[in-house]
Design a protein with these regions (language model features):
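Leucine-biased recognition of intrinsically disordered, low-complexity hydrophobic segments
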Residues: 4-6
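N-terminal intrinsically disordered, cationic/polar leader segments
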Residues: 10-112, 117-167
Length: 167
C-alpha cells in the first residue's frame, strides 16, 4: 500500500507500508521502527512475538500496547520471596491492556516480558505478569523497535525473574 504523507511546507513524501505474513496466522506491518502486529485465533502471544523478533531481526523493543480477545491465560505476580504466584483464567476474556518489552537472553533467543489486564464476561478485571495467553479471536499489538539499544535477560539470584541488563 502506498500512502501519501503531507508535511509542512507540503513537501510530498511517499511511505511504502506493506503487510508481512509470518507463521500461519500472524501478519505485521512496519513504518520506520514501529510494527503493528495482528495475531489470530489459536496462536500463543509470547511465541508469536518471539518469532516476530527473529523474523524481523531486532534485539530490543518496547511493546507499547495491545488489545484483543484471549483464552487459556496463565498470569500472576511475584510475591515478597521472589516466587511467582500463578493464576489460571480459562474462559475467553477481553485483553484490555498489554505492555512490556522484547530482549534477548544470553544464548541469543528472544525473550518477551509482558504484563496485561483482562476483563472477563462479568467485567471483573484480572491483571499481572503474563506467562501464557492464547488468542481467542484476535490480538492487535504495537511494538517500537529500539534499534540502538542492547538489552539482555540474565538470571537474578534468589528470584524466578530474568533481570534486564543494558550493555
Amino acid at each position: 500500500m502506498r500512502m501519501l504523507v503531507l508535511k509542512p511546507p507540503f513537501i510530498f513524501e511517499i511511505t511504502i507500508i506493506e503487510p508481512h505474513p509470518i507463521g500461519q496466522d500472524m501478519e505485521w506491518t512496519r513504518s520506520g521502527e514501529d510494527l503493528f502486529v495482528r495475531i489470530d485465533s489459536g496462536d500463543e502471544i509470547h511465541a508469536s512475538l518471539q518469532r516476530l523478533a527473529d523474523e524481523v531481526g531486532f534485539n530490543a523493543a518496547a511493546i507499547t500496547s495491545g488489545i484483543g480477545r484471549t483464552r487459556d491465560t496463565l498470569y500472576g505476580y511475584m510475591n515478597e520471596d521472589g516466587v511467582y504466584i500463578r493464576r489460571q483464567l480459562d474462559s475467553p476474556s477481553e485483553l484490555v491492556s498489554l505492555s512490556g518489552n522484547i530482549a534477548r537472553k544470553q544464548d541469543g533467543t528472544a525473550f518477551t516480558h509482558i504484563h496485561c489486564c483482562w476483563s472477563d464476561d462479568d467485567n471483573n478485571v484480572h491483571a499481572g505478569h503474563m506467562f501464557q495467553c492464547v488468542v481467542h479471536v484476535v490480538a492487535e499489538i504495537h511494538i517500537r523497535i529500539l534499534k540502538h539499544a542492547i538489552m539482555t535477560r540474565c538470571p537474578l539470584p534468589d528470584v524466578e525473574l530474568l533481570g534486564l541488563q543494558f550493555s
